[in-house]
Amino acid sequence: MTERADQATETPVEPAPPHHTKKPSLKRRPPRWFVAAVTAIGSIQLLTMMDGTIAIIALPKIQDDLGLNDSGRYWVITAYILAFGGLMLLGGRVGDTFGRKRSFMLGVALFTLASALCGFAWNGGALVSARLMQGVAAAVIAPTSVALVATTFPKGPWRNAAVAVFSAMTGIGSVLGLVLGGALTEMSWRLAFLVNVPLGVLAFCLAGAALRETQKERMKLDVTGAVLATLVCTATVFGLSRGPEDGWLAPIPVGSGVIGLSALIAFILVERTAANPIVPFNLFRDRNRLALFAALFLGGGVMFTLMVLVALYVQSVMGYSAMRASVAFLPFAVAVAIGAAASARLVRFFSPRVVLIGGGSLMLCAMLYGSTLTRGASYFPNLVLPLVVAALGIGVVNVPLRLSLIASVGLDRIGPTSAIALMLQSLGGPMVLAVVQVAITSRTLAMGGTTGPVKSMNEAQLNALDHGITYGLLWLAGAVILVGGVVLFINYTAQQVAHASQAKAASDAG
């Protein structure tokens, strides 16, 4: 990334807040412009985070209602994540170039329209297409939201309050998506998408009234690079999803592989010659940072795939309702928070590598235990025990990964580096899920099962699905072992991470 692009991303304009000139204080009631701006940015951030998980709980009902096979079922969530993660870096550049308020409002309008189309989808193709549109919109909204928090609110109490709200919406969005998805799916899975429409309209109106346009920084957009990166992942996932059913030498899997490989080669060539590349390759020259990026990619994939498999298992195999399935995830959310809190203390005394291996060991044990489950297993303690242990491990590994990221580049380049890390973490989800799904589908078919809707399965086919999903957990355990191997190359010390933590805290304080 060029120096000019870095400055455009990380040196925000400091507009004076509308309607007052005195130094702001939170001791008095916040002004209307502040409430409107925070509501606009915070609510749409919540929706984009929710939509990464809200469909997970609804998947079995969507599959039964629309008659999807296993491949089609997973594309309902994969389409959103691929578009979101693959185009996120380009979305941030669009805001810098054409104005963040304008880009934000365009993204909100597109997201709201796509949500309505999801709610009224008449078949699987229409739903996947609308989810793809949602992901494109979210890829514009997410980075421009971050920038708008910095440019809309002046340094001091108001910005700190806005950052707190924004961070809270980001943190609870994924968990709320699981819980709210279950409650809404009990009535209709379509409500899980239609709930976005009124909130999207509200955010659009408030943004138009309260947000101010930022200065535009004309720069060459690397559209080709962003599209090629997304195409690489999409073609790979599509080929992997069709291979077990069609045969690996069938035209679609082979063609997808050729397209993915060709797109990867083209992406490397484009990024090496681009004036303003979407992915600066110089960030990958450091071994520590390269290992860190790989760990974020695989770790994000493990967490995402685990949530999908658990949601599928408790509903399709154990027969839980959507609401009961969402409640089953509550201990998971609590355990992640506890693990993160414990990890924040552990990194003061141990190197990130030690903490990461400890958290990964918890995840590995949980998945190995989960792979032994059978249809007759009860939620407590048979399912909740490995679920909580895995969640503790996820919480533990998240903190040293984030702090190591800051230690790898320093605060002066944390903006573009964090953006690439978030992209890799997002794309890891559908990529790891696609590989694990190959194992699940192959095992299910080998045991006499089917890839059709669960409502049409007999007892033998349900047993085959049970064995397939638990076999998939073994593959997921293998992914955790692979992460552990990558982590061995991360050599940051506890002192470096402590310094990064202090620098980040000072920066967040303004």
Residue ranges of each PLM-predicted region?
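Interfacial helix-cap and linker-helix signal at transmembrane-aqueous boundaries
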Residues: I62-Q63, V94-G95, L180-M187, L240, ...
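Structural signature of transmembrane alpha-helices in multi-pass secondary transporters
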Residues: T48, I77-Y80, F84, F111, ...
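Transmembrane helix-loop junctions and nearby membrane-interface residues
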Residues: G119-A126, G208-L211, L240-D246, I268-R272, ...
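12-transmembrane solute porter fold
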Residues: F34-M50, A55-I57, D70, P251-I259, ...
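Hydrophobic transmembrane-helix bundles of small-molecule transporters
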Residues: T2-E3, A164, T185-L298, V302, ...
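Cytoplasmic-side transmembrane-helix entry/capping segments in multi-pass membrane proteins
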Residues: L106, W158-T170, M219-L228, P253, ...
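Transmembrane-helix bundle of Major Facilitator Superfamily
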Residues: T2-A209, F350, S371
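Short, membrane-exposed interhelical loops at transmembrane-helix boundaries
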Residues: T451-I469
